[in-house]
């Protein structure tokens, strides 16, 4: 019988029954660059840590199991993972990419990969006729779902059908949902990307990235690339992610429950003109999420009545931190215009719906009463200042 995902976050089934070093329950950190050989032509299975390291190998097997893939690759950051994946493509290849992506991905595609001869079509994969953009040289479709930061939801099965009809690789960045809530490979994707810095590690204390695949041809190419480029994750960082993953399930559930309540509270505030959270029934992707995921996650985006109100929130929050990142135990609020999407041209940001009054929340695991209490205080202070010191 298949094991539940909470169990898979803690136990690697294939290792059970084997005696770990001294019976240690915490997987060891093999902090070594190289390995001694018993004799010429003989190896312990590890030769040099750029090629592979026992701690990294254990982590990769754990992440592959969580995403139901045949292999995973642990890299030094989420952007390192995307950069390595782009090495699968050659000059002249064409990739269809969603227009609403993390700003770092957009920067990589248009400032680095295009310079190297890869062509991109940036479209709204939720609404545009994706198939009409497929050309003779198209090799892949690249999506996030939900997207960063506008929380658009793409039908993964629909994208997988298009990819298969045209022999394309479907790549899904699953960072916002984590393997706990969504498994794109099970829905027809070929490759899954994660910024392991976010929910997988979950404590804002390390950088990591992952590529997971269920295709042997892609697995073979990626194993060669990680060996050749030297982008593998260091042993101590691997251990930090392993430790964080053990509590993935309870963190995701608590964060999601908090996000639902905060979204509902924000909907009642007159200064908030829009709350974008897939868990709300009025979200355009709500029904798709119910079909392809086991939850709605803990990311949400809001539009405020003005830039001034948005900036005032950023200045006044204290327990909620104004910081760039997501997926940790702390609740963070981010200003996409100057942070995650600062390098995206203004006209593209605005076309995607990102304005100077847009804020993105990564909801953490604090007591919900404390989170809503702080937001209530912050909103009240701003309203009072707007009214010249008079309470509204």
Task: Go through each PLM region and give its residues.
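Conserved PLP-enzyme active-site core in the AAT-like
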Residues: 1, 17-18, 72-271, 276, ...
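N-terminal "arm"/small-domain region of PLP-dependent enzymes with the aminotransferase-like
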Residues: 1-53, 59-62
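Positively charged, small/polar-rich N-terminal and surface patches that mediate targeting and assembly
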Residues: 2-6, 16, 54, 274, ...
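Glycine-rich beta-alpha junction loops
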Residues: 14-16, 31-37, 176, 198, ...
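Conserved N-terminal alpha-helix of the aminotransferase class I/II PLP-enzyme fold
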Residues: 34-83, 87-88, 104-111
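PLP-dependent enzyme catalytic core of the Aspartate aminotransferase-like
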Residues: 103, 119-121, 251, 308, ...
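A common structural junction motif
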Residues: 229-230, 317-327, 378-387
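Conserved C-terminal alpha-helix-loop-beta "cap" of PLP-dependent enzymes
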Residues: 274-359, 363
